[in-house]
């Protein structure tokens, strides 16, 4: 425990140092010695002036005029000519006003301290692969012509959410930056329709889009990702996807640290399909007291396209291991609240197959919540270093109910967040090695598993939630 607290203090100190550094806006009129590797590209660098908002301290917003260099064309020239871009560190950010586009075989290597920052109002991703292809109207075909062998290593990537969640400075979507745009893409680093790609040693800072957004991705590695005051998912994978490794995600994210979404809300995914054979390991929640979602999501479902075609989007053969202080494991569906649950929902609950949770550590309460038809769920090796509340369970099986109040007083605008009327069946569950800190005895399964049966709330909307008629079915 002492070692963990020391690590937390060290992490918090590093993040605080990064935050203080991020509040300093440097005018870019002088050339840095560190940028000499890019000197031949300087004729392509342009200087512009704009307004940015920064936060000197929480809630204290400052408006500053910034004159800085725009490096988009210069970076793109290096990629187009050499397929390798090296970005050295320098005191000021490298601003871009649109995506850096990577063809097959391209590599970006950035110093860990080099910040690549999106100008306010660009509203695009910062870097993407070349052949983005959206599949909003049907399943991904076999001949999608993916980009291959792309690598991104290092750098601080920021879309300048400089103050609060309500102040994204015009950068909210993380779009493709092309015409016509590809629907559903939403990333700071965006790799969709790709094979054999790698993203590692990067920091995602103060951004509204997903940190790393992958879709229709196979044979991928995402490693050593730091989330710094991030406002969306850290690593977000949409189906179809397979044969991936996500390792070493840490920091403070205000949405899921990692999300594997085979089905998803239509305006946040460019494609749908199974996610299989993925390892997620060494994911650490934020230190105690630092606001963060601290969650991992597995979202299966059944997609109904506009022509009525159905596509099963299961999640299978997934291993999550060495996970620390993640408080919510969200293995359930969730209708689209932004576009309306009647306009975008999975057709029934999704399917999970062969899901493994191994070597998990909780210094505070956390739960695995499952509302999906599941065959094969293993939980093995869990350390519980907190006092267990009487009603706490490690695994909850069954539907959830929660009310979202679009208006605090107009109950006609209230809506159910989840799908409390749907049953789910879970079989082949094995729970072992779950122990309190310092104990050599496993906790009994009955203490760890809760099977949920919803009831309609006769007092709704005077009290919430509305409840439902669905239940979890555990086949033992």
Predicted segments with their positions:
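Intrinsically disordered, low-complexity segments
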Residues: 6-8, 30, 464
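General secretory precursor processing signal
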Residues: 11, 29-31, 427
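Secreted/luminal cysteine- and crosslink-motif detector
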Residues: 9, 27-29, 126
């Amino acid at each position: 425990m002492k070692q963990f607290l020391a690590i937390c203090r060290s992490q918090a100190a590093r993040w605080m140092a990064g935050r203080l550094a991020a509040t300093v806006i440097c005018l870019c009129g002088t050339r840095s010695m560190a940028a000499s590797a890019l000197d031949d590209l300087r004729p392509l660098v342009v200087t512009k002036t704009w307004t940015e908002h920064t936060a000197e301290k929480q809630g204290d917003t400052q408006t500053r005029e910034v004159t800085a260099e725009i490096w988009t064309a210069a970076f793109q020239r290096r990629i187009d000519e050499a397929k390798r871009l090296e970005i050295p560190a320098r005191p000021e950010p490298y601003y871009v006003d649109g995506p850096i586009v990577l063809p097959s075989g391209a590599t970006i290597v950035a110093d860990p301290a080099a910040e690549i920052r999106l100008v306010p109002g660009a509203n695009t991703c910062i870097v993407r692969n070349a052949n983005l292809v959206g599949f909003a109207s049907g399943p991904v075909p076999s001949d999608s012509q993916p980009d291959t062998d792309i690598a991104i290593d290092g750098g601080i990537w920021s879309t300048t959410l400089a103050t609060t969640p309500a102040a994204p400075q015009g950068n909210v979507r993380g779009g493709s930056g092309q015409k016509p745009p590809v629907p559903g893409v939403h990333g700071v680093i965006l790799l969709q329709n790709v094979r054999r790609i790698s993203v590692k040693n990067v920091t995602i800072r103060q951004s509204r889009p997903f940190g790393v957004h992958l879709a229709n991705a196979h044979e991928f590695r995402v490693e050593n990702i730091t989330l710094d005051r991030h406002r969306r998912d850290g690593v977000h994978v949409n189906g179809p996807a397979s044969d991936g490794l996500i390792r070493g995600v840490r920091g403070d994210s205000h949405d899921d640290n990692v999300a594997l979404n085979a089905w998803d809300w239509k305006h946040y995914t460019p494609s749908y399909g199974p996610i299989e054979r993925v390892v997620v390991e060494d994911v650490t929640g934020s230190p105690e007291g630092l606001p963060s979602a601290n969650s991992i999501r597995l979202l299966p479902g059944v997609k109904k396209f506009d022509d009525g075609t159905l596509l099963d989007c299961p999640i299978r053969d997934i291993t999550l291991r060495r996970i620390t202080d993640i408080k919510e494991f969200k293995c359930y569906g969730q209708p689209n609240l932004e576009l309306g649950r009647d306009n975008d929902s999975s057709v029934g609950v999704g399917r999970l197959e062969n899901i493994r949770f191994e070597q998990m550590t909780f210094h505070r309460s956390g739960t695995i919540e499952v509302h999906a038809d599941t065959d094969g769920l293993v939980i093995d090796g869990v350390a519980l270093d907190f006092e267990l509340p009487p009603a706490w369970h490690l695994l909850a099986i069954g539907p959830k109910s929660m009310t979202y109040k679009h208006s605090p007083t107009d109950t006609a605008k209230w809506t159910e967040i989840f799908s409390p009327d749907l049953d789910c069946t879970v079989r082949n569950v094995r729970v072992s090695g779950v122990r309190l800190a310092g104990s050599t005895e496993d906790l009994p399964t009955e203490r760890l598993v809760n099977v949920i049966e919803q009831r309609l709330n006769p007092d709704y909307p005077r009290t919430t939630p509305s409840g439902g008629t669905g239940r979890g079915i555990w086949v033992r």
